[in-house]
């Protein structure tokens, strides 16, 4: 039931235009034409006819597709397969056509191609009808959706009538058979709208030859009369939209060496961008500035080796001096030309006018005008005086107001300064209060922390010798050094006494030894002389006494003994030790004094 309803709707939507189709066939029959054709009007070529019956059908079953490549625009018939998809169109003009997928031409359901004469061995072009009549533009519009035929694989089923986009006329004699075999399919118009997709950017068109609307008269009035305006006729022999060459074996796939139109368009766009970039770089490249007024640029050779310029232009210098500027002569007075004739006559006094009658009105006017002018001047002076008075009053008011404003500004400034000063004082009070509270807290913390620390510190300092007895320190500093000095003096005096005693004892012993030796020598000399004393005997005691005196003098000299030699370095070391102890005691005393002062300050602060 649903299938029959869909068939009925499809039959109702399909237009019944069989008489129009017959009229179209009759118009498509080849006949001589005398009217000029518009460019693009004859954009269909009929393929060779296999039979007389196929001439009317194969003449308008063709669609021309415009493709633009590097060489220009070309048109090829588009072959539609059984699946209804558009194959890829070749870019060349003369290329063989690929046969259908099943190897047969014409209608697969009715056999119209082979039996009915729609497409034989010589008529291989089978295209889907188009629905866009008119002339082809210079470039195909990529945004126009392609117009495809119905879902039936036969391209002879429907064709668009001229001037209609939605009217399809069945052209196959067995179109009903296809309708039955296709099942519940929508009409060709709805199928055309469904199959149209923006992704397939192929522009298709078709147009019938028609006579141009000629406004000229058929015959000229005068043989020598020139036409008012030239008439441009279109020659289809040079029209790019007309296919050239063999159309019997067009291929649906491009040749291996044929470039892709999309790739060609992309290369052209890249070439345009590169050219535009190069032009921009040329414009941005630094060039020689233009010459100043009165000069011009001259080409100069910059090669390594100079060459003679044969075609040198002969230049000639010429001079021209103008006269000095002269003063402008005075402009003559303008004297207008006379327009009448001069006539002389004699006029006596009192003949032309009465003085009293003529002068009195003029005098009244002059006097009245003078009085009026004087009154105006007086009024103006009064007005100026009033303006000055009002201006003076305004200035006084303004000065008073300015003084008041200054007073108020000064008062505001004083208030602001007082406010800032009060804020500063309050901030200082708050700051001092915070500082005092922090000090009190720190003091309390220090007291609690030092409560147990001070005794231990004092004990350790006392144990280390930093706290000492003043009496003991006075004894160590004042008494002990004096005692040591006195002891040293006493010991030194005793050492000196001992040394003197030793020297005296030595001297006495030496004298006695000398006397003893002299006595023995005297006894030895007396014995050989038989006890006779001579002059030698009398002189020897003198010699002995001299030697004795020398020995005594030598014995009287203080000789350094071992004790004196040992006592000298001992005394130096002792003095150095005593001085170091004194310095240490002085430093300890200073430290103790500082600690006492700090403790007193803390007690006062508490």
Curated annotation (Swiss-Prot):
Composition bias type Basic and acidic residues, residue spans: 15-46, 573-606
Residues annotated with Phosphothreonine modification: 331
Residue runs in coiled coils: 393-429, 572-604
One GO cellular component term noted in the UniProt record for this chain: 9+2 motile cilium
Protein name according to UniProt: Radial spoke head protein 3 homolog
Keyword Iron-sulfur included in the entry's annotation: no
Function, in words: Functions as part of axonemal radial spoke complexes that play an important part in the motility of sperm and cilia. Functions as a protein kinase A-anchoring protein that scaffolds the cAMP-dependent protein kinase holoenzyme. May serve as a point of convergence for MAPK and PKA signaling in cilia.
Compartments where found: Cytoplasm, Cytoskeleton, Cilium axoneme; Cytoplasm, Cytoskeleton, Flagellum axoneme
Quaternary structure and interacting proteins, as annotated: Component of the axonemal radial spoke 1 (RS1) and 2 (RS2) complexes, at least composed of spoke head proteins RSPH1, RSPH3, RSPH9 and the cilia-specific component RSPH4A or sperm-specific component RSPH6A, spoke stalk proteins RSPH14, DNAJB13, DYDC1, ROPN1L and NME5, and the RS1 complex-specific anchor protein IQUB. Interacts with IQUB. Interacts with phosphorylated MAPK1. Interacts with MEK1. Interacts with PKA regulatory subunits PRKAR1A and PRKAR1B. Interacts with RSPH1. Interacts with RSPH4A. Interacts with RSPH6A. Interacts with RSPH9. Interacts with LRRC23.
Residue span of region Disordered: 1-103, 520-606
Key words of the record: Cell projection, Cilium, Coiled coil, Cytoplasm, Cytoskeleton, Flagellum, Phosphoprotein
Highest taxon, organism lineage: Eukaryota
Similarity comment: Belongs to the flagellar radial spoke RSP3 family.
Record's compositionally biased regions (Polar residues): 547-556
